[in-house]
Amino acid sequence: MCIRDRREGATVEKGEEYSHKTPIVFYGSSIVHGVGAGKPSSNYPAIIGRRLDSDFINLGFAGAAKAEKAVMSYISLLTMSAFVYDYDHNAPSAEYLEKTHYDGYKTVRAKQPDLPIIMASKVDYYSNEAENEKRRLIIEESYKRGIAEGDKNLYFVDGRKIFDEDLRNESTQDGCHPNDVGYLAMAKAFGDIIEKLI
């Protein structure tokens, strides 16, 4: 949809087609959803969608992204050009994450053997460094295991490294959820990878 003007007599016309019609799918927490963004178009999936002129599906669930089998099975059936598996925050513990992260990835991979999959660890790494390091290592182990099993289209984004160190405090609204500064950094980290894949 394209709105040309808000004044009386304005028209609503069909928008231009995306260069990449097959959507990028993003799965994760309130951070994927965009809870800290200044406006709906400022979360990192939306920024990447504009940058790459690609359709996208935002499956960000505030407090509820737990990689349940039914959810991952549903995701595995979606038509997509790439899958961003930003699952970490909502796992209630590192132990839960360890039980579900790799299995969630394998559920999608089993249905879509050639799909680019990008795993990520949390960006608010320094909020609880000991716990978050456990989680980061679990996700990195899922990645390494997939690579060892021959997955040639699997990628890992280390959340510790996304925010500029000089702007770490300015990159979230509450020490956890990225604001527009943080989302720009996330969009660059993920977008630079996705741009080469779709």
Enumerate the predicted regions with their spans:
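Short, small-residue-biased leader/transition segments that mark boundaries at the very start
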Residues: 1-3
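Catalytic nucleophile-elbow at a beta strand-turn-alpha helix junction centered on a G-D-S/GDSL motif
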Residues: 21-42
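Oxyanion-hole/transition-state-stabilizing segment in secreted/luminal serine hydrolases
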Residues: 36, 40, 48, 65-111, ...
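A general structural detector for well-ordered alpha-helical segments in enzyme core domains, enriched
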Residues: 44, 100-104, 135-142
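Short helix-loop-beta junction
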Residues: 45-57, 144
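Catalytic His-Asp segment of secreted/periplasmic serine-dependent ester chemistry enzymes
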Residues: 76, 126-198
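A short helix->loop->beta-strand "cap" motif at the edges of active sites that frequently abuts
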Residues: 112-117
